[in-house]
Structure formats: C-alpha cells, structure tokens
C-alpha cells in the first residue's frame, strides 16, 4: 500500500522574542523611504547595534588603530556546502596566494586521527577595501560522514607550505526526520545606498549585525538543523565585475560570511538577481552536481543534492533557458528515484505577493518555471525576491487547490513559499490586491526565517518573525 503523505504548514508567522534578562530586546526598527513600496532598516539607532559596532566592527587597539571586522572586511572565510549526499561535504574559501589547498578532518579535536583531503585552486583577482585574493579554494570530501557525529576540521591554502587554520567543528545530524532552516534575501548592503567601502559603512555593518542575529536565533529555534537553505540575493551590489563592483561585492560578502554558524552548518544557496551578473558567487561556494553548467549565468549554474529521503534542486532563475533547467531536473530526478519528497529552490517568487515583483517579473517567469514544477512532480518550491512572506495554495497547472486547516493529505500540485527577508535590510510592501493563489501573506517589517521538518509522511513548515 502506498503511504499517505501530508504537507503541513504551521502558522504564517510566529513571533520570536529574545530577552537579555526579563525584558525583550527589540533589535529592529524601520522607516519608510521615498520609494513607496520599500522599507529600510533603522537599526543604526538601536543600542545593541551601536555596542556591537563599537566593540566588534570598529574595534580599536590601545593605540586607537582599527582592528575589528570593519577594518579587515574578511571575505576569505570558509563556507561549508552540502555534498551530493549526507555522507559528503564541500568546502570553499579564498586565499591571498594560489597554492594546493587541503582540509584535514577527524573525530578528535586535536586532529590526531585526521584524514587529509586535497582540493583545487582557481586563480582569481578579487579585491575589497583591504585585501586582494588570488585564489578560490575548493575541497570536496565524499563518503566520510556518519550520522549524529561531531567532526573537527582545519584547512590550509597550500599543503606544500602549510599554515593550518584554527580547528572548527561540524556535527552531522540524522537523515530521517530531519530539519532545515530556510532564509531569504539577506542582501547584505541593501539597507541604504550602495556600500561606501569604509569601516564606517553603515549599510554593510547594519546588515551584517542583523543577519548574524537572525542566524543565531534560527539556530536556537532549530538546534538540530542539518543545513541552511538561502533563497538568493545573499549580497546587494547588482553590477558587473568592474573594479569598483568587485570591491563592493567582496565587502558585502565579508558581511554575509561573518556569522560563525556558517563554519559549523552547511549552506545551500541559490543565485539571486543581485548576484547574477558577477562571478564571485561561483568562487564562494562549492555546490555539488554543478559540473555540467546547466542554467548558467556569469555567477554559476543549477545544482542538486540529496539528503535522506529528500531531493533538493537549486535552479538559477536568472537564466530563462527552460531546456537546460529541464535537463538538470531530469538528471536530478532520475538519479534519485527513491526520493519521497522533491524540493526546488530558485530566487524569483513566481507565486509571491510583494508589490514590486509578484505581478511583473514574477508573473512573467511563472510561465517558464511553473510548468517544470508540474512536469517533475515537485512538492515544494522555495523562493525569495519580494522581501515579504507568502505561501501559496497548492498549485497545479495554474489552478489553486484549496485545503483545510493548513494540512494537505496526499497533496497534488506544488506549494510555493516566498521566504521574506532574513536580515531586514529592506522590505517591500504587499501587493494592494491579494492574488487568487495566495493562502497566507505577511510583511511585519521584521526579519523572518523558517524551519522545515521532513519525514517519510510529512513536511512541516514553521515561519517565525524575529524581534
């Protein structure tokens, strides 16, 4: 007998309040700009932020010299990415010189039992305010990782002249009844005008602070999360790879990669419209099953991976070539015939409800991507772009399938989620008229994140406001 499957959504938004003692800490505040559809953060007036800015971002030594994050703008930090399966893991980081990169991994914190894995280095020329990076380093480790196990790792830019990094930890989780974290549009640098490229750059500093706070709360809410899903626009600067453009983009990546959680939990991203024209995205991440280059723009391509009984597929929706996207989807689905659930992530919210995009480019892209979701029986599609939360009804061939009590049993069609803003760098107002396909929508002008629980029988999605 075929098992029944349920798709369950718990609440459109559940408020999370963080307290230092017994009193709530209000981290975010917003003010409307001259753009009638857009709201930007006013975090620079919040005391928690000013303390962090003075003691971390603009930290000074005894001689008054800047030594903090805003001085280094370190976009070389290592990022973990999911491997092809739960037994695999990807690593990516920048270095000042090109060498032969490697990662060593063991179960003992002193790495006395470590195995060494060599990778590849690609020559680049990426500068921010402080550094010029000459290599993008990637290492892929396959078949090593067991469930519910803590591993320790260190990495070097060059095994021939090794200077190993400090030891970091990575704890695997179970692959049945597992949980992920979903975020949308961190868009570091978007809280005002384009980045100014100094230690006092309000936009990058503010968005880094808020992005880190959201991830910290997400980890508290979902301590057993296996990895993070980010639905695009990790950074803000949308220009091409001009010298100035690369400078600003790498400074924004310094903010995006700042949270320590990204050294401990794999991150699966998709390419947003703000990343699509530059090449830095493909240098910062080591995405699995991307070697065919299907769905490519300058920034990178489609890719996929499996975790437990779920197939995850990331499509580059900046590329409108449905032939290539179909080829990737076909390869992914045929390679994972036992997947109980199929989840696609791309940036543009084809069933969103934000004022700027849902009835313009979102509607146009719907004609391209929605038929692919129907064709391959995709259960859930995760998107961003409109900086407001939206959940569709189950959609099949453009028709909204109603369901009661936020639970669908043996559902037909695809559920579409627009993730909102994880950093609160900016928000878009909701469309004046609620579209026919929208089951729930929200713009509380507070950053959001979601947890997604997967089992053989169900997917449960909970979305939180973080204040």
What residues fall within each predicted segment?
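Extended active-site neighborhood of metal-dependent phosphoesterases/phosphodiesterases
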Residues: 147-174, 195, 199-201, 242-338, ...
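Active-site-proximal segments of metal-dependent phosphoesterases and phosphodiesterases across multiple
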Residues: 198-203, 210, 238-249, 339-381
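Conserved, compact domain cores that house catalytic/ligand-binding motifs in diverse enzymes
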Residues: 178-270, 275
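Solvent-exposed loop/turn segments at secondary-structure junctions
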Residues: 186-190, 234-238, 273-277, 312, ...
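Active-site neighborhood of phospho(di)ester-bond hydrolases with catalytic His/Asp-centered motifs
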Residues: 182-184, 227-233, 267-273, 316, ...
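Bacterial Sec-dependent N-terminal signal peptides
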Residues: 1-10
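Mobile, glycine- and charge-enriched loop segments
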Residues: 175-198, 325-363, 421-423
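Acidic, histidine-bearing metal-coordination/catalytic regions of metal-dependent phosphoesterases
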Residues: 11, 22-199, 445, 455-467
């Amino acid at each position: 007998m075929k098992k029944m499957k349920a798709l369950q959504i718990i609440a459109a938004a559940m408020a999370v309040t963080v307290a230092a003692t017994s009193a709530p800490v209000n981290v975010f505040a917003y003010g409307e700009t001259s753009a009638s559809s857009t709201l930007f953060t006013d975090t620079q007036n919040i005391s928690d932020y000013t303390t962090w800015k003075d003691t971390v971002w603009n930290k000074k030594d005894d001689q008054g010299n800047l030594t903090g994050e805003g001085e280094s703008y370190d976009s070389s930090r290592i990022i973990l990415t999911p491997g092809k399966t739960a037994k695999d893991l990807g690593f990516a980081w920048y270095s000042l010189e090109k060498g032969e990169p490697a990662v060593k991994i063991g179960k003992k914190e002193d790495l006395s039992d470590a195995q060494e894995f060599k990778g590849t280095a690609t020559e680049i020329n990426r500068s921010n305010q402080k550094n010029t990076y000459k290599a993008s380093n990637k290492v892929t480790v396959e078949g090593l990782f067991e469930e519910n196990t803590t591993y320790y790792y260190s990495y070097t830019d060059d095994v021939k002249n090794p200077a190993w990094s400090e030891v970091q930890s990575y704890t695997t989780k179970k692959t049945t009844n597992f949980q992920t974290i979903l975020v949308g549009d961190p868009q570091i640098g978007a809280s005002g005008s384009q980045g100014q490229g100094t230690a006092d750059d309000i936009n990058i500093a503010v968005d880094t602070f808020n992005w880190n706070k959201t991830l910290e709360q997400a980890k508290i809410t979902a301590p057993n999360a296996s990895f993070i899903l980010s639905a695009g626009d990790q950074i803000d600067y949308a220009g091409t790879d001009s010298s100035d453009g690369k400078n600003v983009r790498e400074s924004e990546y310094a903010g995006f990669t700042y949270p320590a959680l990204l050294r401990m939990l794999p991150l699966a991203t998709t390419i947003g419209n703000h990343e699509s024209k530059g090449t830095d995205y493909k240098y910062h991440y080591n995405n699995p099953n991307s070697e065919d280059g299907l769905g490519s723009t300058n920034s990178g391509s489609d890719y996929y991976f499996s975790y437990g009984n779920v197939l995850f597929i990331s499509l580059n929706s900046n590329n409108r070539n449905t032939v290539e996207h179909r080829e990737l989807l076909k390869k992914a689905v045929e390679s994972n015939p036992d997947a109980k659930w199929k989840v696609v992530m791309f940036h543009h919210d084809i069933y969103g409800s934000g004022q700027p995009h849902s009835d313009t480019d979102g509607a146009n892209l719907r004609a391209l991507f929605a038929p692919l979701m129907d064709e391959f029986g995709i259960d859930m599609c995760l998107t961003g772009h409109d900086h407001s939360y939206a959940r569709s009804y189950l959609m099949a061939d453009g028709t909204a399938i109603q369901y009661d009590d936020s639970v669908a049993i043996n559902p037909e069609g695809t559920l579409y989620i627009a993730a909102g803003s994880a950093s609160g760098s900016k928000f878009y107002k909701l469309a004046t008229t609620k579209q026919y396909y929208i089951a729930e929508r929200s713009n509380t002008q507070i950053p959001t994140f979601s947890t997604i629980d997967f089992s053989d029988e169900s997917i449960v999605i909970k979305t939180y406001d973080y204040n």
